[in-house]
Amino acid sequence: MLTGISGVMAQMALEQAVSEITDYLKEIDAKLDDLLRDQKDQTVSKLAGISHMIDETMFIYQQVGSISATTWSKVSGCPQDIATIQAYAIAKIKSLTEKAEREQDPKQVRPLTQQIRQEIHQWLGMLASAVKMQDQVSCIELARVCQEEPEQLEAYKKGIVLARNKRLEEIEQSLNALGKQLEEKAKTVGGQVLLNPYSSPHAIANIESIASDLNAFASTLQLEHIHLHVEDGPTWIEAAGKAVDDTGKACRMPGSRPHTPSKTSVMR
């Protein structure tokens, strides 16, 4: 294990992050398994293999307490593939965000949000896996540097922290963009309940589910800048009642009076 106190603290923080992400992944494991099983894309298909290799290397390190050149060679090339996986998932989330931004028809918000609700678990799972795997590689890298170049340990630790923050910031920005569009769509369909009594409540329910998923992910990765909250829209009865009240108020306004038929119209 690392001998420098600073290095040990950094490693412990990364290992704690890995543990929390692992717990999160267990909760959405079925969705991610479906993606890996059905996806023919080469980028996605690499995920399981890379994860297995990194887990094996971490196990060896924990058993032996050191990182040999052979052990390090197993994972030294993984960061490039991990970065590709993260970029792929972010691109998918951006695609969903752009679809939400383009859709202006309130009636189409329900199928759109249903699609996002079905897909978001998979892309969040990929992002969580990418962060977890990179944290594991960083633990191994710190151990390797401590063995081979202990005088460089502090600089490596700072570099790893900065790189991790940059990756999380990119993820955070993509999720905030999606959240902003969902909030806008919630406001739009929330005001259309009277005209769309079926699709609007279902769209709101979809958006609330997506918001819950995004917040759970943000909490796991401690992305403090994601504050996604969707208020419940009015029910049809509430919307209808408000419409009646508004009409009544308009009729009671000064200068407004009920229409009375003229004598001519009565005679007819």
Cite the ranges covered by each PLM segment.
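Detector for methionine-enriched segments
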Residues: 1, 9-12, 53, 58, ...
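Amphipathic, membrane-active segments
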Residues: 7, 11-69
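Long, helix-rich, hydrophobic modules that act as membrane-proximal anchors or helical bundle/coiled-coil regulators
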Residues: 73-268
